[in-house]
């Protein structure tokens, strides 16, 4: 169906302006102050609403295949769409992990039939699947990137063989995304704390997975990338010390090394373990208020390039085990845009910066074709937001399959009212049209 969005306040490419938007055959046909048509069309009255490019989340864990008691591509993509996330890139630590081209394509096939949002999937790496990883080079336009766990996390896909890392960094033609935490430091910290305390608790998590563990691993990844001229993207930066590894003196398009920050590291601090315990246990750990403040500064001055969620759902039971057994990760994809709009209302970030870090910059970093901007000719991945319609997170409106959120009872000052994906109105004021499915993302490489 074609649509005419009337009188929207558009937030795009560092500008805010009033305009109509004509959507035709899945793409943005026209952006003009007032559009007069000689034929009938479905109109959306956007008076008083803000139109954003759909958010693109470059790091989610949707748990399919193999872990579908936690989540599925269908359930989590539905939650994403309700929150204004119109495209996602999913990580390889499913069961089995995406270690072969066939296993990777199996995930694409699931998404083709079930995902309400647009999608791409990272190829997984291990110490011994180099040949399969290199086959991604010929598919560079069809795969978002290669994921390397340089520290162990959920799924234990740790790559710790220097020869394997050397070969991948030297020969991959795709973006390499890394989870950076130093395994040796983590194990030493754990053993020391365990010997001292006996029983560990959630507040010990940032002591075990500390600043030094993050910095040493990120530093090592940067050294590999500089040695071989690799395209490196370090995920979920969580410490002030790591920020020295990144620059803001060149345009994003020219950067070979980029960095992501996640909404939970911008929102929570180590002070919140007392209240939320294992619910905010994640890797890398949520750390001190000083680290949070440094991350905000780096985001706003462009040393940190994109905002993501690292959406990682687990069941309530899995999160409420004793600390050592409790699973790491938290569900966030439904609430990331609204959380950033909360910080807009708090005066922390502008609307233009939100659009940049959650849409424009992600599209630029990954060279995504025809998405991430409100431009004529681009796919109509668009989100309407009511900045004056508060919503409180509760069990009734949480769409994650796991059924909980660390933000439960938090009231956002704004709501997502409409989500268009490929020109289709998939979400409107709590109602979904599931007759349309998302598309596989393509990349201009």
Model region roles, listed by residue range:
Residues 131-307:
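Histidine/acidic residue-rich metal-binding segments in metalloenzymes
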